Design a protein with these regions (language model features):
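Conserved SAM/SAH-binding loop
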Residues: 32-36
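FMN-binding flavodoxin-like domain, especially the glycine-rich phosphate-binding loop
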Residues: 3-4, 9-16, 20-30, 40-130
Length: 130
């Protein structure tokens, strides 16, 4: 099963969770603000993560989702960290489903203060889809 992990993080919490998910999947977590983030080969599971910034997704993540080729992704699984709101999960889901990419109902949401030391939680979450 092929897997990829993509994320955008300003403060490092979402990056930390992305790296835990990637370790569980045996892949590298890649920030969407890098050229390496492009999905060039089809993946069965794409973990996508981000947070809410000023009531929306960061422009890097939003743009990357807009450019994502739906034919390259069999299913997306969402994760997010934030201080107060899970709304980033809804916004990512909307963008992906609008492209015709199936999105897993289960998501991983951690409040920012919970992200540190969340390795076991993130790995257990990832293993459900691998």
């Amino acid at each position: 099963m092929s897997t990829a992990v993509r994320y955008y993080s300003r403060g490092g919490k979402t990056k930390e969770v992305a790296e835990y998910l990637a370790q569980a999947a045996g892949v590298q977590a890649v920030s969407v603000d890098t050229q390496a983030a492009a999905i060039k080969e089809p993946v069965d599971v794409l973990f996508v993560g981000g947070a809410l910034y000023a009531y929306g997704l960061d422009k890097h993540l939003s743009s990357w989702l807009d450019d994502l080729d739906a034919k390259m992704v069999k299913k997306a699984v969402l994760f997010s960290t934030s201080w107060i709101s899970k709304h980033a999960l809804d916004l990512m889901r909307e963008k992906l489903t609008a492209k015709g990419i199936p999105v897993e109902e289960k998501t991983l949401y951690l409040k920012s203060k919970e992200a540190a030391g969340s390795r076991q939680t993130a790995e257990a979450f990832a293993k459900q889809f691998l």
